[in-house]
Amino acid sequence: FLELAPSPAPRQAIEEVVQPTSEDFSALVLKIQANMDPNHHDRIVFMRICSGKFEKGMSVLHRQSNKTIRLSQPQQFLATERTIVEDAYPGDIIGVFDAGTMGVGDTLCAQKHKVTFGDFPVFPPEFFARVSPKDTMKRKQFQKGMTQLAQEGAVQIFEQPGALDSFVVGAVGMLQFEVLEYRLKNEYGVDLLNHTLPYSVARWIDGDV
């Protein structure tokens, strides 16, 4: 299979075109998944190695926060099985634990050679709803769950000034609201109130006042 698969391609960064043959490490965050282990409520960041060699326990620069992060316990997944990764190369996708620092589209790179990959495209939502917890005593779990699921890209959150117990959320399809409701109930123990809103677009308006 590896002999038939295409080689890793160069990737355009803001500063330059990153070649997979470069010795300087760089990686792009492709996906975030919370609660892959329901017993530990972990948060796994999946990243694609774009250049250089990944080694277990290495420290890299997170470009968006400009902080140094140590990538410990890197893993690869096959169904429910997890395998610790000692090293990885361009084209490989690995998962690492994250406490909430990284987001989809973020860049990790070597300190000595800084690059920044462009943002991921975000599809504009076409359906909107106001969601809130049925039990107001579970506001903390509700806010945590909404934040983590929005970071995954399950829905987009549009915050309302002063609203702590509800969020306006947007989705590309109605199925996303069902997924949101199911995951909040099963992963965070929060039953959801979902009120559909009569909107179809959300846009930033530029202009002079």
Enumerate the language-model features and the residues they cover.
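Structural and coupling elements of P-loop NTPases
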Residues: 1-209
